[in-house]
Amino acid sequence: MYFMAEDYATLGHYDKASALLHSLNEAYRKGGQAVNPVFEAYEDVYSKLSKCGTFSVERPNNNVSVPLLTHTGNRKNPEMMFIMANINGQEVKCTYDSGAGINVMTTKFAERIKATVIQTKNIQMLGMSYADSKGLVVVDSLKLGDLVYRNLPFFVVDMRTDNPLANKKLEELGYECVIGTQTMMPLDEICFDFDRMQLVIPASYTPTPTYAPNFYHSPQRLYHLSLTDGRSGRKIDAIVDTGASGTILTNRYYKKNENCFTGRMATDSLRTAGVGSVNVVKTIPVSWTFTLAGEQYTETNIPVIRSSEQNEEYDCRIGLPTLMAHRKFIINFKNMWMRFED
């Protein structure tokens, strides 16, 4: 029922999504079981969104192309990738983030567009750490080139941390809005053309190729696909994250493969700043190979997370340097496949 509710929400049918989640939550209560707080929170969110106008996408009959920008101007070490959008008449640099299950704007930007913040049950969001939403904003319009979203929801978050260096970096990045997977799913297909540095939204989707791996959309609204791990020889679960500055093997991967790291010490620390705080983890640097759709890929130096408080539900996060090493990266939502093109 949760996935049916999410399907309704993706299409903008928030009343139906809320009703389904209400039925699910009531069934838990009547059965004497604890209600999943995520289900309960989204029942409240969708109920309130149903009163804010219908979500819709207006698109032309032609391809839409939007320039892609990186923070460094270097595809090998991009740090962050952005697109320029227009939200309620205000130009803003946004992260176009396949690793974000929701759309997010800073409290500062919400004030800038004079948005009305709707209070909802608390939603915890996983960036580099957990942070609580300050509420919900529904924007009248978000424009990407000739593409227009209407009545699009954003969660409002104070991204500042208690670390001055992290705050300085966030200010440098100009981190004001995150456009997440909710905006991608209704488009049928998107193409990251890294050679031309453009996000292309084609007028018609590509027929399914013979070698493209399938992926699924998780309850956390992330895009998961299966890889063959060159170290263990087993299938592992990866997410594709266009908002991630690097590729990592998670603490879950480490725990499942500790025997592969016998005698290896966590010699490095990885310090990351994200939504609301700073996180420091111990890492082991490794060279790593994986196979996807019959093609083998090698990462010469990526971190394995030796310790973490985040309890990731995946083994690997594929970030920007890995993705941008290819000419193109296509995500097809019509038939749920991904493909690199070289």
Kindly label every feature range from the protein language model.
Residues 1-342:
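Pepsin/retropepsin-fold aspartyl endopeptidases
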